């Protein structure tokens, strides 16, 4: 609410914006009272109510959409609720991808600082204990190695019930939500693009029909009288018609460009999220394999050497997967931010042209 206060008084002076969403229907201008003594108090009270309600609505908007909403007061953004909701959904979904990446980075740091550290300790203790008995594996007890492996298994198995695993649960929740919203956004943008194409085809068809309808009577008169032909501004009439249809066509093309930039950004983000999903599955598989190997080594102590070799190989796979996940997370976040930047530029261009033409 505090964030919106500098702009709200300016907005309330503009034309009504109750078409944006159902919550804004309450923002109607206050009716005057017949009682002069109470009119000032009533107007002040209703203005404050409107200000609070508008502030609550602005709080539910995405930050970028709020800026567009404030800046371009003479455009379709205020009078087209579908466009407003589409922009709000787009920026919210795209920023959800960045939040997903932040959540995943937290999980990766936890895995690096806990699981990898426990495995490194087990491998180091194994080598030290093996050397401590002069390489004689039969005499080595590997007490520290078994302890480290038990610690790893305890962390891995009990982690689902501890507070540390809340980070991973939060990541899974955000991942499911993010993936669903991206898929919905792709469908919405595809439908919007098809609607714009239909409008463009209708505009071109109407242009031909209207031009013919306007010029047909003039041409008929020309055939009847050469004198009238010299007085009728045929070229000016056709130029006027062409300019009006050209403005409509250019506006639709700018809108299509803005929607296209949003669609490309969402598709790239969706592909990156799916890549991350595959890498997360691979990470879970590696961790599960290490846990089973460690459990086998603790129970079948005679096979500790073979088990530790497998643990060493799995440790390399774990490290490689973490590196790949970190790289893809950075790319995903970067693509999402870049997509929002490009889309915001195209949307601003589309709205600013509409704002200038309306003035």
Swiss-Prot record:
It comes from the Eukaryota. InterPro entries: DUF677. The chain crosses the membrane at residues 214-234. Its main location: membrane. GO terms for cellular component: membrane. It is a single-pass membrane protein. It is found in: Membrane. Keywords: Coiled coil, Membrane, Transmembrane, Transmembrane helix. Residues 179-208 form a coiled coil. PANTHER family: PTHR31113:SF19, UPF0496 PROTEIN 3-RELATED (PTHR31113). Belongs to the UPF0496 family. This is UPF0496 protein At3g57100.
């Amino acid at each position: 609410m505090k964030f919106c206060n500098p702009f709200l008084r300016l907005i309330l002076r503009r034309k009504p914006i109750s078409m944006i969403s159902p919550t804004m229907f309450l923002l109607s201008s206050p009716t005057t009272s017949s009682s002069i003594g109470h009119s000032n108090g009533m107007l002040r009270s209703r203005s404050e109510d409107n200000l609070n309600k508008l502030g609550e609505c602005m709080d539910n908007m995405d930050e970028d959409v709020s800026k567009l909403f404030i800046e371009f007061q003479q455009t379709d953004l205020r009078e087209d609720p579908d466009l407003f909701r589409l922009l709000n959904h787009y920026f919210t979904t795209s920023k959800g991808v960045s939040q997903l990446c932040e959540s995943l980075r937290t999980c990766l740091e936890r895995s690096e600082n806990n699981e990898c550290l426990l495995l490194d300790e087990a491998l180091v203790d194994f080598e030290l204990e093996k050397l401590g008995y002069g390489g004689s594996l039969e005499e080595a007890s590997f007490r520290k190695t078994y302890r480290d492996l038990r610690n790893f298994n305890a962390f891995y198995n009990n982690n689902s019930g501890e507070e540390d695993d809340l980070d991973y649960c939060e990541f899974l929740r955000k991942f499911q939500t993010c993936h669903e919203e991206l898929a919905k956004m792709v469908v919405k943008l595809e439908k919007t693009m098809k609607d714009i194409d239909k409008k463009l085809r209708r505009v071109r068809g109407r242009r031909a029909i209207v031009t013919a309808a306007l010029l047909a009577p003039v041409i008929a008169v020309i055939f009847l009288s050469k004198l009238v032909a010299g007085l009728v501004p045929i070229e000016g009439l056709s130029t006027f018609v062409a300019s009006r249809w050209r403005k409509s066509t250019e506006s639709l093309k700018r809108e299509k460009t803005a929607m296209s930039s949003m669609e490309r950004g969402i598709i790239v983000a969706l592909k990156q999220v799916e890549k991350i999903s595959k890498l997360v599955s691979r990470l879970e598989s590696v961790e599960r394999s290490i846990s089973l190997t460690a459990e086998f080594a603790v129970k079948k102590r005679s096979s500790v050497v073979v088990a530790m070799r497998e643990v060493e190989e799995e440790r390399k796979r774990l490290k490689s997967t973490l590196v790949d996940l970190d790289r893809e997370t950075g790319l995903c976040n970067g693509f999402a931010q870049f997509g929002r930047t490009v889309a915001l530029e195209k949307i601003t261009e589309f709205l600013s042209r509409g704002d200038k033409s309306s003035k």
